Regions:
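Membrane-associated feature with strongest affinity for ZDHHC
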Residues: 1-168
Length: 168
């Protein structure tokens, strides 16, 4: 009795091999079950904080590397799969996962794969522009928050500032 003083009731007979104050959750017969999911590691128990530095469940909640774990990094959502993360949609994670797979937050329009920094590479490698026809020139009338380009017809790749006009 009293071996696992952090589990209630403290007077119960529990096994605490790692001396962290929490009893083993699957003890031998005749011993009261505790809340320690890994009684071989003294830093693993229900009062511990999850950390990205380990590959196991630190806080006994059955999840490994929870959102917001210690030493996590912001990963930004890339819902349009253009390789650029949304500027305000982030989760602090241990690893990239699902749509939260970008470490940058440069995407000015995460609803269009043709709108991101460098989309109009013939005009700017860094400005956020929309290039719907993928001709390298940005739309002259883009949505709010997106820099205007020089393409007067962004639905036709044959009409842009880089194409020579022909007389018929």
């Amino acid at each position: 009795p009293g071996a696992a003083e952090n589990d209630a009731p403290a007077a119960a007979c529990r096994k605490d091999d790692d001396d962290d104050g929490y009893g083993e959750d699957a003890p031998p017969a005749g011993v009261t079950s505790g809340t320690d999911c890994d009684d071989a590691r003294n830093l693993v128990n229900i009062a511990a904080s999850e950390t990205c530095a380990t590959a196991y469940d630190d806080d006994c909640d059955t999840d490994t590397n929870d959102l917001g774990a210690l030493s996590c990094s912001n990963f930004y959502a890339d819902r349009d799969a253009d390789g650029f993360g949304h500027e305000t949609d982030a989760e602090c994670r241990c690893d990239a996962e699902g749509v939260y797979n970008e470490s940058d937050n440069d995407d000015c329009d995460d609803g269009s794969a043709q709108t991101h920094p460098g989309a109009a590479e013939s005009e700017s490698a860094t400005e956020c522009r929309r290039d719907e026809d993928l001709d390298g020139y940005g739309d002259v009338s883009p949505p709010s928050g997106v820099s205007a380009g020089d393409d007067c017809d962004d639905d036709d790749a044959e009409r842009n500032p880089g194409v020579n006009e022909r007389c018929s």
